Amino acid sequence: MAFVLSLLMALVLVSYGPGGSLGCDLSPNHVLVGRQNLRLLGQMRRLSPRFCLQDRKDFAFPQEMVEVSQFQEAQAISVLHEMLQQSFNLFHKERSSAAWDTTLLEQLLTGLHQQLDDLDACLGLLTGEEDSALGRTGPTLAMKRYFQGIHVYLQEKGYSDCAWEIVRLEIMRSLSSSTSLQERLRMMDGDLKSP
């Protein structure tokens, strides 16, 4: 979790360096939806993590993603977008619906989609000619590989209930870190606009 928090802190630092704000305002609703997504993930718990200790795994979030000097504003938003997109894809899988309460799952997918729409607007403002290359940059590619490892883990574990519980906890940690930082981002943006 520390490495995910470090990555997201790097995203905020880059966004609020000497150049100022991101150039896009995340709505207050964006943060509220993020909190709701976390509550939904908490409610989706079906097993005690104690029963799944043998299935624990370090998903090896890449440390090189926390190098602030490597990030530009568009890359930072792109990485955050990739995290939400991959989370959406993960829970949108056909096999995911067997593991969760379908009402909670649908609400989570709707919330993730709303957050992605907000970030799509930011990406549109921040990207120009570099748009096509963003998905191939180191940080975004590393995020894709991180989630690919999660997909492989689920396959290897036969999409078992314990495997899904471990993944739910991992995604909950990641989204928790991103939600906290998005709240700070909104507060900092408000401070920058104050007289």
From Swiss-Prot:
MF annotations from Gene Ontology:
cytokine activity; type I interferon receptor binding
Query: Which GO BP terms sit in this record?
Result: adaptive immune response; B cell activation involved in immune response; defense response to virus; humoral immune response; natural killer cell activation involved in immune response; positive regulation of biosynthetic process; response to exogenous dsRNA; T cell activation involved in immune response
- List the GO terms this entry assigns under cellular component, sorted alphabetically: extracellular space
Q: What is its main location?
A: secreted
Q: Which SUPFAM superfamilies match?
A: 4-helical cytokines
Record's keyword annotation contains Disulfide bond: yes
Q: Which UniProt keywords apply?
A: Antiviral defense, Cytokine, Disulfide bond, Secreted, Signal
Disulfide topology: 24-122, 52-162
Q: Which Pfam families match?
A: Interferon
Signal peptide interval: 1-23
Which compartments does it reside in? Secreted
- Which Gene3D superfamilies does this entry report, sorted A to Z? 1.20.1250.10
Family, according to the entry, reads as follows: Belongs to the alpha/beta interferon family.
What is this protein's name? Answer: Interferon omega-1
Biological source species: Bos taurus
Q: Which gene encodes it?
A: IFNW1
